[in-house]
Amino acid sequence: MEENIKIEVTDKDVYKHYFSSILIYGIVFLALSICPVLNEQIEHDFCNYIVVLGAYYIGYVALALPIFLFFRPESILESRSVAILDFIKRQFKFGLTVEERIKNIEPKENEKQALVILFVKAFFGYYCVNLLCNKYILSMGYNIDFLKEFFNQAVQYGSVSGSSFGIAQYIDDTFDMWRQLIVMVITFVLGFSYLTELDLFKNKIKTVDTTPLGIITCISCYYPFLILTDKLIPRFPEQAIPVDNFTLRIILNVLVVLAHLGMMLAVLRLGTKAGNLTNRGIVTSFPYNIVRHPEYSMNMIYIILTTIPVMLLGEFSMFGKIIIACGIGLWIYLYYLRAVTEERNLLQDSEYQEYVKKVTKRFIPKVF
């Protein structure tokens, strides 16, 4: 009977992985730093994605080698950085025939996985860090003070006109701040997940979706690709909802905040396993024991809440309303495609296959 033999991680393996990684990550950081489209998003000199990712890269360069030498993780033996460099080196081999050259252009499966995982970490890691720096971190204290101040005003409203009116007025004044704080929490969790991959956090990437449809449907929802998506599919921000009726506006605002709370709950439940395109392990607790894609369900609800009022209450022609209705349908279909393509990757995992048998609906409990 053959015994399982543990392969030793040598110093050579460690150094090869380490220097391959700092080279690959350095190239990625340089590309992100000089990309004009991304640089246009920088709003603050000392709090921007270049500073944060630069500090992250320097920390990796300084700390990774001694950590690798001490712990010697077996994942080094299947280094994705080494796989990427092997793929790049193969493109520059001399003396190959045309057939061999064409064959070399196609990455091997481990190389394809490594390349897409690198893209996912770089693109979505940048996206989350940039969003936090530009919109949330520096204004967090102001937002919290704003909510406290308006809460005090709401108490005053309630003492004069009744508690119901005070609560309603508080919601009307502060719903967008609550929405921003919720999105900040979601973005922080996602950013942490994208920029870490450790056994300690139980978020090692098993597989990633490498299909063109899966990647395109995912990145089309994020800047800068969102610019093109917005050109093709009409979209309206919630601030543009033309609702003059106070009661209806309060109801819509509450529903929008609840939808965001649903998104946050779904992301927090995933924790360090959260993220697009990747399988980092299966989560089956609430709300994932109700539907398989609760975050996308909440996104669909959010789309409906911020577009249906535009269509019904705005001054649009019949043709304009048809265009808006088509836009709503296309955005919802985009999230449906994201769910389907994600599951195509996740279904390679036997644990997810069992999960699908137990939780049979994607978006709406007992319906769809």
Language-model features: locations:
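Membrane-anchoring alpha-helices and their flanking helix-loop junctions
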Residues: E2-L277, L305-L347, E351-F368
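Short amphipathic alpha-helical coupling elements at transmembrane boundaries
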Residues: S285, N289-R292, K357
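Alpha-helical membrane-protein architecture signal
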Residues: R280-Y288, S297
